[in-house]
């Protein structure tokens, strides 16, 4: 993840994706804790996710938000969509993301929608392939978003100008 993004300079919004009650079985019975999965973003090209565990739900969410702020990435956005089609993968979670025409909206489910909306993507088509576990879907989506390249990046890699590349 990109570490040079300062979360204090961004106006971050947070969204809780899941809160899960987990149990540790001990001799005297079960010990319950809560695991939270949170996505944060500024709706302007910066997004991150984090996890937190604690005895109480609010404390787990707070830990997850702090973790998410440490894992911010920058997402290239062209207009209201992404620059090109991309396939993100993590474990058995696969997410296919395609740019969409303006006015389409975010066509996506669950955790992927939370990431894309908080990243500031307004029009996109997505399809979840494989595992639908929230953590795997989030990591697969972030993997895809980190691999996005703008036309300027591709032109620089090829040693050409953007005009030569596009036309």
Curated annotation (Swiss-Prot):
<dbReference type="InterPro" id="IPR013810">
    <property type="entry name" value="Ribosomal_uS5_N"/>
</dbReference>
<dbReference type="Pfam" id="PF03719">
    <property type="entry name" value="Ribosomal_S5_C"/>
</dbReference>
<comment type="similarity">
    <text>Belongs to the universal ribosomal protein uS5 family.</text>
</comment>
<comment type="function">
    <text>With S4 and S12 plays an important role in translational accuracy.</text>
</comment>
<dbReference type="GO" id="GO:0003735">
    <property type="term" value="F:structural constituent of ribosome"/>
</dbReference>
<feature type="domain" description="S5 DRBM">
    <location>
        <begin position="12"/>
        <end position="75"/>
    </location>
</feature>
<dbReference type="Pfam" id="PF00333">
    <property type="entry name" value="Ribosomal_S5"/>
</dbReference>
<comment type="function">
    <text>Located at the back of the 30S subunit body where it stabilizes the conformation of the head with respect to the body.</text>
</comment>
<keyword id="KW-0687">Ribonucleoprotein</keyword>
<keyword id="KW-0689">Ribosomal protein</keyword>
<dbReference type="InterPro" id="IPR005712">
    <property type="entry name" value="Ribosomal_uS5_bac-type"/>
</dbReference>
<dbReference type="GO" id="GO:0006412">
    <property type="term" value="P:translation"/>
</dbReference>
<dbReference type="GO" id="GO:0015935">
    <property type="term" value="C:small ribosomal subunit"/>
</dbReference>
<dbReference type="InterPro" id="IPR018192">
    <property type="entry name" value="Ribosomal_uS5_N_CS"/>
</dbReference>
<protein>
    <recommendedName>
        <fullName>Small ribosomal subunit protein uS5</fullName>
    </recommendedName>
</protein>
<dbReference type="InterPro" id="IPR014721">
    <property type="entry name" value="Ribsml_uS5_D2-typ_fold_subgr"/>
</dbReference>
<comment type="subunit">
    <text>Part of the 30S ribosomal subunit. Contacts proteins S4 and S8.</text>
</comment>
<keyword id="KW-0694">RNA-binding</keyword>
<dbReference type="InterPro" id="IPR000851">
    <property type="entry name" value="Ribosomal_uS5"/>
</dbReference>
<dbReference type="GO" id="GO:0019843">
    <property type="term" value="F:rRNA binding"/>
</dbReference>
<keyword id="KW-0699">rRNA-binding</keyword>
<dbReference type="InterPro" id="IPR020568">
    <property type="entry name" value="Ribosomal_Su5_D2-typ_SF"/>
</dbReference>
<dbReference type="InterPro" id="IPR005324">
    <property type="entry name" value="Ribosomal_uS5_C"/>
</dbReference>
């Amino acid at each position: 993840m990109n570490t040079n993004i300062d979360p204090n300079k961004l106006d971050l919004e947070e969204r809780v994706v899941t809160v899960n009650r987990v149990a540790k079985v001990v001799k005297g019975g079960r010990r319950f804790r809560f695991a939270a999965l949170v996505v944060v973003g500024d709706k302007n090209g910066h997004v991150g996710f984090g996890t937190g565990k604690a005895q109480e739900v609010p404390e787990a969410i707070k830990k997850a938000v702090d973790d998410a702020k440490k894992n911010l990435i920058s997402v290239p956005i062209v207009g209201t969509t992404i620059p090109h089609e991309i396939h993100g993968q993590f474990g058995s979670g696969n997410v296919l993301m395609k740019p969409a025409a303006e006015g389409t909206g975010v066509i996506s489910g669950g955790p992927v929608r939370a990431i894309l909306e908080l990243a500031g993507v307004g029009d996109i088509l997505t399809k979840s392939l494989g595992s639908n576990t929230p953590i795997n879907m989030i990591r697969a989506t972030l993997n895809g978003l980190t691999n996005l390249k703008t036309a300027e990046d591709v032109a620089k890699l090829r040693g050409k100008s953007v005009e030569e590349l596009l036309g």
